[in-house]
A protein has these predicted regions:
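Short acidic, glycine/proline-enriched helix-loop-strand junctions
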Residues: 66-67, 105-128
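NAD(P)-binding Rossmann-fold cofactor-contacting core
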Residues: 22-25, 31-52
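A charged, well-structured terminal subsegment
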Residues: 125-144
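Structural motif
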Residues: 70-71, 95
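ADP-ribose/adenylate-binding Rossmann-like module
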Residues: 88-111
Length: 144
């Protein structure tokens, strides 16, 4: 089993950092999708603290969440990742997941030192679809 498939099978609680209250943003679409497939997703956005996104209370930072977090899923620029990685270690999360286009070598090293799984430049929604949903290819009907 691949590491990603194992992560998505084993861990079901996600702190999603950088979720927007705009329903057209990728972060909100991914959050809704993961909720629909059985994941408990906590939105983290300091600008929306105390509000609700997709019926979930929004937290300012991951350390404000009282429940145990398995995956910290990041929708923030790479330059902000290391601070989030430090918080990931502090809360005892099992995985730091960086969305498409996001990378941080120092964060990767920190995760390795603390035995925390690290995924970069991958979308949780797309990876879930790849491993767990066998979508039939739709072909257009051709006519004369």
């Amino acid at each position: 089993m691949s590491d990603i498939k194992e992560i998505l099978s084993k861990y079901k609680t996600i702190a999603m950092v950088g979720v927007s209250n705009d329903p057209t943003k990728a972060s909100t679409i991914v959050m809704k999708y993961m909720q629909e497939y059985g994941y408990k997703v906590y939105p983290v956005n300091p600008r929306a603290e105390g509000k609700k996104i997709l019926v979930q209370e929004v937290f300012a930072k991951i350390s404000d969440i009282k429940d145990q977090i398995d995956i910290v899923d990041v929708f923030r620029p790479s330059k902000e990742v290391y601070a989030i990685a430090e918080d990931t270690v502090k809360i005892g999360a099992k995985v730091l997941w960086l969305q498409l286009g996001i990378r941080d070598e120092k964060a990767k090293d920190l995760m390795e030192k603390n035995d925390i799984k690290y995924v970069e430049n991958k979308c949780t929604k797309m990876e879930y679809q790849k491993y767990f949903l066998k979508v039939r290819q739709a072909f257009p009907v051709l006519s004369d």
